[in-house]
Design a protein with these regions (language model features):
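Membrane-embedded alpha-helical bundles of polytopic integral membrane proteins
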Residues: 2-241
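Juxtamembrane interface at the ends
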Residues: 184-189, 254-262
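Juxtamembrane boundary at the C-terminal end of a transmembrane helix
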Residues: 291-298
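Membrane-embedded alpha-helical segments of transport systems
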Residues: 179, 211, 276-284
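Interfacial loop-to-transmembrane junctions
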Residues: 259-282
Length: 298
């Protein structure tokens, strides 16, 4: 056993998990990204089906996390309300009226449902979480559908007809992913000299990562808004807001995981963790980009 201590390849073993994890992350992206882009290209009910599946998977991850806490929100009710938001996004003309009716009915039904539970020690918290999770998941995904619209992309020989809705959704996806990537690598570059951003929620987050990630988001938005004919200063402003929204989304999910004493939300995406781990920034970014598109006349 003594000679094993001097094995020439032993110093390399600590790096093996990192290389393996990076390989898994890359493989997951190479497989998943074309699938996501294909559904974004198709739009309409095809994209609705994809987001519906994502909604179910994220709800299951939240269910698993909540089981590790003392809270018991009615996540099936959250799922139904979130799915209702998705359906309404497919009918934008009728959406305002139906939204008011749906939210009103949800409030009236959820209150007696949760408070009829015994014992009722956490009934008020469970009621609040039931509604909060519906908005946390369903509202951002419905914003993606509203941004995309139902005009399908078309291929014409050597060129493509890309609807504006595709560019808006790409702006959400690639804008937030560029922020995540920049924040991760730039934050790591300053490890040991960083300034913590929210140490009690996520010790690994730092101000250097936020600034670096936001700069990457700004550059991404400048490039991706060119087909939308937005002025450069609007693209810069959008990049800054997308960066801040991405960090808020990341910290929000980290807070949920900390409550559950969990490192990842799940294991659905090898190398990345769960669906929520990959989409936390997108949930907040989609709402911001949708509001922005309405303000500039999307």
């Amino acid at each position: 056993m003594q000679h094993a201590k001097h094995h020439p390849e032993e110093p390399e073993t600590p790096a093996m998990p990192r290389r393996s994890s990076l390989g898994l992350r890359t493989l997951t992206v190479c497989i998943g990204l074309p699938i996501v882009l294909a559904f974004v290209w198709l739009g309409g009910w095809a994209m609705f089906a994809l987001l519906g599946l994502v909604l179910v998977l994220m709800t299951l991850e939240l269910r698993s996390l909540m089981r590790r806490t003392s809270y018991r929100p009615s996540l099936w009710f959250s799922l139904l309300l979130a799915a209702f938001f998705l359906v309404l996004a497919m009918f934008p003309q009728q959406r305002p009226l139906l939204l008011e009716i749906g939210i009103g009915v949800a409030l009236l039904l959820s209150f007696p449902l949760l408070f009829s539970r015994l014992p009722a020690q956490h009934a008020l918290s469970d009621w609040g979480l039931t509604l909060a999770f519906a908005f946390y998941l369903g509202w951002p995904l419905s914003c993606l559908l509203l941004l995309r619209g139902d005009q399908a992309g078309q291929l014409h020989a050597i060129w493509a007809d890309i609807p504006r809705g595709v560019w808006w959704v790409l702006l959400v996806l690639l804008g937030t992913w560029s922020f995540d990537t920049g924040a991760f690598y730039i934050g790591r570059a300053f490890r040991g000299h960083q300034h913590p951003l929210a140490a009690q929620i996520s010790p690994g987050k730092n101000w250097e990562g936020l600034i670096g990630g936001t700069c990457c988001a700004v550059m991404g938005c400048i490039i991706l808004t060119r087909p939308l004919d937005l002025p450069w200063y609007q693209a810069v402003l959008l990049g800054i807001v997308v960066g801040c929204a991405g960090m808020c989304g990341d910290l929000s999910e980290s807070f949920i995981k900390r409550q559950a004493h969990a490192k990842d939300s799940g294991t659905m995406l090898p190398g990345h963790g769960g669906i929520l781990d990959r989409c936390d920034s997108i949930l907040f970014g989609s709402v911001i980009v949708y509001i922005f598109s309405m303000l500039v006349g999307g």
